[in-house]
């Protein structure tokens, strides 16, 4: 299984250095929780890992090779869920899931989309426009992608935001199963998360 490695990463925004000298190594079955106060660069680091930004210094390697030189071989193995979710108000829950999956390279039929949304506790709401859903329900629509994406690396920015206790347990279950099958996860969260059988690696940004 591949590894994800950060080597001496530096992030600069404007005239401010958010972090420097960041190193980590994530292996199969591993979960890395990125921690730090607001403005410390947590989201910036995740954006680097998914190719939306570049480090001012340092390298990010996937199985020993810089991610920029891998192109689709890396990006096709990764799913990124940002903290905003990307749910479109005028589309139904099922349309949102199918379109976001298609953008990630997954041709999702309506039956599988329905099953994923039902698993996330949205049974009966699949055909409702997203604008009538609560923030927690909209977040569940976004997180349903994890059931259908089929990628080894998940990069999750505040996945537990706006979720109630039952939804948090659902997400914890998804994470546990993904790690049990050799998946890898990098995530930020302001909440403590307990994952059965997982050694959580914590990366502190200051």
Swiss-Prot record:
Coiled coil segments of this chain: none
UniProt subcellular location: Cell inner membrane
EC number: 7.6.2.5
Gene Ontology MF annotations: ABC-type heme transporter activity; ATP binding; ATP hydrolysis activity
UniProt entry tagged with the keyword Kinase: no
Protein name: Cytochrome c biogenesis ATP-binding export protein CcmA
SUPFAM superfamilies per the UniProt record, alphabetical: P-loop containing nucleoside triphosphate hydrolases
Primary site of residence: membrane
Stated family: Belongs to the ABC transporter superfamily. CcmA exporter (TC 3.A.1.107) family.
PANTHER family for this protein: ABC TRANSPORTER I FAMILY MEMBER 1
Positions of the ABC transporter domain: 4-205
One of the Pfam families matching this protein, by short name: ABC_tran
InterPro entries for the chain: AAA+_ATPase, ABC_transporter-like_ATP-bd, ABC_transporter-like_CS, ABC_transptr_haem_export_CcmA, P-loop_NTPase
Gene Ontology BP annotations: cytochrome complex assembly
GO CC annotations on file: plasma membrane
UniProt-listed NCBIfam families: ccmA, PRK13538.1
Role according to the record: Part of the ABC transporter complex CcmAB involved in the biogenesis of c-type cytochromes; once thought to export heme, this seems not to be the case, but its exact role is uncertain. Responsible for energy coupling to the transport system.
Membrane topology qualifier: Peripheral membrane protein
Catalytic reaction(s) noted: heme b(in) + ATP + H2O = heme b(out) + ADP + phosphate + H(+)
Gene name per UniProt: ccmA
Species of provenance: Nitrosospira multiformis (strain ATCC 25196 / NCIMB 11849 / C 71)
């Amino acid at each position: 299984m591949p590894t994800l490695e950060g080597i001496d990463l530096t992030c600069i925004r404007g005239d401010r250095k958010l972090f420097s000298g960041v190193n980590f190594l994530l292996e199969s079955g591993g979960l890395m929780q990125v921690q730090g106060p607001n403005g410390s660069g947590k989201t910036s680091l995740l954006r680097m890992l998914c190719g939306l930004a570049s480090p001012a210094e340092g390298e990010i390697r996937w199985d020993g090779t810089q991610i920029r030189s891998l192109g689709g071989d890396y990006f096709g193995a990764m799913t990124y869920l940002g903290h905003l979710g990307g749910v479109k108000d005028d589309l139904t829950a099922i349309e949102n899931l199918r379109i976001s999956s298609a953008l990630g390279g997954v041709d999702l039929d309506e039956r599988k989309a329905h099953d994923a949304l039902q698993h996330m506790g949205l049974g009966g709401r699949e055909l409702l426009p997203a604008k009538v859903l609560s923030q927690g329900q909209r977040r569940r629509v976004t997180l349903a992608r994890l059931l259908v994406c089929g990628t080894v690396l998940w990069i999750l920015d505040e996945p537990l935001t706006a979720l109630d206790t039952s939804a948090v347990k659902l997400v914890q279950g998804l994470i546990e199963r993904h790690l049990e099958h050799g998946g890898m996860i990098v995530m930020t969260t302001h909440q403590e998360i307990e994952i059965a059988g997982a050694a959580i690696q914590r990366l502190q940004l200051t």
